[in-house]
Swiss-Prot record:
Protein name: GTP-binding protein ypt1
A single cellular component GO annotation: Golgi membrane
Organism: Schizosaccharomyces pombe (strain 972 / ATCC 24843)
Membrane topology: Peripheral membrane protein; Lipid-anchor
UniProt-listed NCBIfam families: small_GTP (TIGR00231)
Activity modulation comment: Rab activation is generally mediated by a guanine exchange factor (GEF), while inactivation through hydrolysis of bound GTP is catalyzed by a GTPase activating protein (GAP).
Protein's gene: ypt1
Top-level division of the source organism's lineage: Eukaryota
């Protein structure tokens, strides 16, 4: 048994490029924010450990590239994931419309019963918002998926999003501590790299 944690969960952040996945990860893992973040090529991950309902949970959070042409790279990373957060940009209708495609990717590559969470990011950009909360909530409810609007810029609901996902995975796993020890999710540190490609608004 590992004395450092009771649970080790692998989470994925997926969604179109530019919706703010990397910024959500930076805000949750490091409590930092930058207006212009280098777009992720391939996969990168961060780790954060915290207490949840009297247990120590270690999250390994993978930030997958959103561009269509990199989906073949990230498909292998769906395997072994305990939870997947689908992110769209509340100021970008197309990114919300594409959520259905990302859900199909989950059905195709992830394990059956994997926990899912829908997140509408950049909620601080009220004047530019085009995807209404009620529309996204109705969509999420129809699929029985939890839904939150977040802002990596002002921290709104970022912590709540990851805690919600962690709590759901913990409930699904029951009292099986070290739940992920049997999952085929081992990956080598350093496989994911960041390459300077383009800057994107990170909200």
């Amino acid at each position: 048994m590992n004395p450092e944690y009771d649970y080790l969960f692998k989470l994925l952040l997926i969604g179109d490029s530019g919706v703010g996945k990397s910024c959500l990860l930076l805000r949750f893992a490091d409590d930092t924010y930058t207006e212009s973040y280098i777009s992720t090529i391939g996969v990168d991950f961060k780790i954060r450990t915290f207490e949840l309902e009297g247990k120590t949970v270690k999250l390994q959070i993978w930030d997958t590239a959103g561009q269509e042409r990199f989906r073949t790279i990230t498909s292998s990373y769906y395997r072994g994931a305990h939870g997947i957060i689908i992110v769209y940009d509340v100021t970008d209708q197309d990114s919300f419309n594409n959520v259905k495609q990302w859900l199909q990717e989950i059905d195709r590559y992830a394990v059956e019963g994997v926990n899912r969470l829908l997140v509408g990011n950049k909620s601080d950009m009220v004047d530019k918002k085009v995807v209404e909360y009620s529309v996204a909530k109705e969509f999420a409810d129809s699929l029985n998926i939890p839904f939150l609007e977040t802002s990596a810029k002002d921290s709104t609901n970022v912590e709540q999003a990851f805690l919600t996902m962690s709590r759901q995975i913990k409930e699904r796993m029951g009292n099986n501590t070290f739940a992920s020890s049997n999952a085929k999710s081992s990956v080598k540190v350093g496989q994911g790299t960041n390459v300077s490609q383009s800057s994107s608004n990170c909200c």
